[in-house]
């Protein structure tokens, strides 16, 4: 898939695209959303054959910033927090002939990190130089602008030997929890789909026949207004909307997502908090052959993001 925005299931149906309903019943892979910042891309630049680091600007069509040297980092990011982050990434991330993207969590030396809104608590002080949560791999034949994204769901795909100092100490602490669909028993494997939601999904398909869906342009406006309601803590009341049947259907899909989310679990990850409150995670991403969708509690994180002084404008 191209490097496109991943949507919530309920937002994806506004135009009448019901792909997500069948996707819930497909074999899927789950990954845990990590609330890190900034997003870092690294790997081998197919255009030059050189190792690089950068932000998502490496994919820009025009203002491209692919940092292959320390001098380029200083030129483009000198005097900003990104200078230190990218410099450490250039020095510490293992060289690879592949291309990855991950969320930067912080520098070693602490046991608690709050890169954005969520605080992550590790069981002991992090000894590695940097902490990275990889989530995406890209394939690009000749130019990063043509990169195609694939979810990185394999637990810890990076060999320890690829990120160690000569004395055996580590450069990078990888954070990639193992996510799974709970089957009601103890263990880390669970089910491979949300098949137990089949009756609800079939009901939703029947309900869809009576809904007047909207154009992509209209859907964008609906999303904007729905996000505003969620951020401001307002209840989404279908009867406040001209197309009340569409909003009722949106709420139905949102409830199916909540049921799916209640079945998601993960292991091998740090504890997560918002303030003093322990939470499961920021959420999950469901990956299927039909696409990927976000599974998360929008109300919880929109409020937290909106209240976070690091954000000028939050998006659900």
Predicted features and spans:
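Core nucleotide-handling region used for phosphoryl-transfer chemistry
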Residues: 1-28, 33-38, 42-316
